[in-house]
């Protein structure tokens, strides 16, 4: 914020494109660029000497909280997910602004962690729309009974973004918190806690409606979405859990994040 308005507007794109925009390609290139500028163009010493990291930290913190609050106001499911993306990108920026090795590691890890969780949620939103023709949260009453696998994956993705263990979102946020304490900063930890609660706040009503509110009679004619949609959803949801339990499995996320962080702070030594 305040350069975010294009991102919620981009959610009108088809679901695969939305997932690509919000979870993998476009937005992540921006935050990775910030990491490169902080680490290599300015360097941690210059960032600290001129208090540039403090300015960046304030911007990231405000964006995290404000984007979460704006997500509460969105009835359109994909639009709520879009504001969630705005907030979670700022976790990555916050990691860079901490200019501590563990903070930077946590921010870099959140690039990958957010990708699996947010792809899961956007795929779920797409499956709901294709299968039930519903896109507003207020219309999702009782859908877990007809789409149990889709909503189960949605719960996993939501819990991960809220930072609930043992999902990968908890791991990256844990390193962000430890990195904050490493630098003697408590306010970023407070921001992480508050934003985690806000994440629960704007995801829980969706889950509550789906599982505990009675749906309309029109749901009786529907079943679970096509396996061509459900299988990718379950794969990304399971990856969110697996990479939470084993961050270095397959792609060595923690090892790569630590290596990049060490390169920035130690010049590759």
Task: Describe the function of each predicted region.
Residues 1-209:
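Hydrophobic transmembrane alpha-helices and their helix-loop junctions in integral membrane proteins
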Residues 145-149, 204-269:
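Cytoplasmic/organellar membrane-interface segments at the starts of transmembrane helices
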